């Protein structure tokens, strides 16, 4: 599964970066040798990502809490600038007191808890990140091997329906069950 040097949270990569896309393509090349194997039905993209072991995780909150200047952070801040236009409008919606949009580069804990608008913005961006997390490697794998199913990521569990974002890229949505 593709990784990036900078992480958003635990093993969650900077999924909106070019590095993630390139690593997805490079990792998918490993499938070429078995693309015509009639004994194989498919493959799992990964197994139980460690970032997903946190109940009700809002990934965009981790973007703003993480001190790294990631591509995800750049795109989140750009989306907020586009939506709100002024820091005053953002402050009103989010119930915050930022001096300017650059304040968003400083670690901010639990941004989605600041207001309903903040929660909506953060959950929307989290879904964009989750979609990229799943879609980019899925497409890279299908380009190399269109003959086998993508069997999902073998989630440990799903604590929030948003974690299923991007499921349409799988042929099978898989969850490990240890009951």
Q: Which residues make up each language-model segment?
A:
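Alpha-helical scaffold elements lining the catalytic groove of polysaccharide deacetylases
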Residues: 20-21
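Polysaccharide-binding and catalytic clefts of secreted carbohydrate-active enzymes
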Residues: 9-14, 26, 30, 36-164
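Extended hydrophobic/aromatic segments used for targeting, binding, or gating
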Residues: 156-179
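Conserved thiamine diphosphate
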Residues: 17
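Catalytic domains of carbohydrate-active enzymes, especially glycoside hydrolases
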Residues: 1, 41, 173
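Short, charged, surface-exposed secondary-structure boundary motifs
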Residues: 2-10
């Amino acid at each position: 599964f593709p990784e990036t040097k900078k992480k958003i949270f635990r093993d969650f990569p900077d999924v909106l970066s070019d590095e993630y896309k390139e690593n997805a393509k490079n990792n998918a090349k490993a499938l070429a040798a078995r693309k015509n194997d009639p004994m194989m039905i498919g493959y799992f993209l990964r197994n139980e990502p460690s970032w997903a072991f946190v109940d009700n995780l809002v990934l965009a909150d981790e973007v703003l809490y993480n001190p790294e200047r990631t591509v995800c952070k750049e795109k989140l801040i750009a989306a907020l600038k586009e939506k709100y236009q002024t820091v005053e409008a953002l402050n009103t919606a989010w119930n915050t007191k930022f001096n300017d949009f650059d304040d968003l580069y400083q670690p901010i804990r639990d941004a989605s808890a600041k207001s309903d608008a903040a929660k909506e913005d953060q959950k929307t961006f989290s879904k964009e990140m989750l979609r990229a997390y799943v879609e980019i490697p899925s497409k890279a794998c299908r380009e190399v091997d269109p003959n086998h199913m993508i069997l999902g990521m073998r989630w440990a569990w799903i604590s929030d329906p948003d974690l299923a974002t991007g499921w349409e890229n799988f042929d099978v949505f898989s969850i490990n069950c240890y009951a």
